[in-house]
């Protein structure tokens, strides 16, 4: 064979080798894409609190779509593994990835705070949720689920402390950087001698005797508890009894709905009230008020009108009208306080504004002015005296002042944080006075304050020139004003671990909760790379 023939043969063999290599590369790329897709679908299943088995349903839908849109590509869709077992493994891997990302951020935290709350799941197991909010040197805030701890045997303050200590240790969060703890105020968390907060405070002092942990009682929970001082039992009990009579029996309920349709009412039904949800109570009272004429007619049809004489008494109807108005005011406050990532000083400002409104209500009611009580205003001609309403508002005002005492201690610092350019620097702490003067005389910084978010504004301050202002802002911006994120996550837990899915393990529940609440995005490429041999589906 001549040299030229050898060269031709070598070129041909080389071309065949490249062709074979390309086949393997294409197969590998196809498998990698299929694995990536299965991770994305599993992530969305977890994010939306769907069952692991839904992966198989999603795949069947994908194949049906492929058959209609691109039948020649069906094989690629078949390669996407979405069996229940695969979805579970993918979710576990995503959880591990998000946990690792959080762990990488921890060293950058200047300070961190915790939000704690406990509740029971469908199996009657007490679950403790621990959320962490960390703030970095450049004021980047991270708010993530730290841990879900299952408390099978006991929920004492000492045991909960051990759970928190274990969670901090796993994430390598240093005690000396803990700024505050926010709870819903249950006894096991707030005990003065052996409660969790006492143990946490002692531990922080052991590590750094100059530091004092800030303890806050959830603003939203406090606001709800304030309603308990309103003497409304004589209003609520008959309303609940009426609603139960209408809705408890199917025949009564159907007949009432038919009556509403015949009368051409705007509402199609009355609402149930659950004792633990004050928001629902306000809506129930409003609905009963709007349908009081139809309810009276229905009770007469049933021969039950004598059992509910309140519906014909103007004094009781006036009390119902007042209850509706004050509950609507408070429900509006409650709604404004809700939301993830809200700063504590913003929530406190909202509460302070409501306290000022209460003062106005009290003063005006004492003068028989009911402008801000529109439902009560419809009963104006039948109201003999507004004294009892004035007393209720005064009691509510006092209860707000009492329950928000822990936030009141921070009021002066909150004022400086939120209004540094208008605060009186002479009344500020000595360490902040000179910095406030420099700040208030800087027109550039004033413009930044007016255009940027509060965290970005404080991040823009020179570290050496405004060291104390930055330190104060770091401490206050890292606070949890409420345990709303815990309450929201418990709702997600109840969706995931329901009667139909009660066999979910605690590990899987924690994975689902972390994924559904996290602001971080999974590193899909890294997750796929970690799977050396992507599996084909079945």
Regions found by a protein language model. Give the residues of each.
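Alpha-helical structural modules in large enzymes and assemblies
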Residues: 1-538
